[in-house]
């Protein structure tokens, strides 16, 4: 007689699309909300491949016996590295950044992802959206805002109806109790009391949520293709540990972003918005290569964790290049 609990078999077969592990579903996942993406770099010197540098560095460190052809190639790499002015390193590396078509808080607001009685959260949310988005909220109906966001006329689903009810209630205005005091607030009042004045939505790196049974690297490549319109075979994934960005968002939920590092194969590739790419057209407003300083300054000041990802990567690449350059010079003197 089989006395095994059937629920345990179900748990073993279940798959969490959040953390990518078996044994539970995403609603029961204890991990932060996970997105996976790629930070793609461009090195503004021809014939410098970061994966090759990392590989050769390990071989030199491990006293690998190089062939004559490999030594000739190493000498060519040294000649290229000798042209690099590390005092101008900030302009040597460029990073591929994307700008959201709509700010994250605006999307959450239109989707009704808030407690209408949570005044503190609503104040933060309205503060983090752009000036243009505030004007749209102030001057347009919910039907218009919904269609403008999603690019379709699907106004019959449950999320639309629930979000519409919340929006119209906020438009009309309502009283809530805060610290035992009845406070009146409305959309107009929230907009009037905003402090920040952002001109454009957030800039960041291509990333997104996992599909069912999708591995981390598969998710990262798919999201990269959808958001940049650059095929993943046009980049090389660098043999580096993925970087992580973990933070507590304004909705009090914990998020974790995992970024693989990649190098573009052809420096002449110009990123652009492709109107035939529906995923990109709906989600992405702009895309471009940026120097380290420009990228660091365009990321919103409160996105400290994202700035740290960029800074740590930038310093790490510099260390890899400098360390290889020094060890290569010492090695070639012995040949």
Task: List each language-model region with its residue ranges.
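Core residues of folded domains in eukaryotic genome-function proteins
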Residues: 12, 34, 94, 201, ...
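Cys/His-rich microdomains that often coordinate metals
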Residues: 23-24
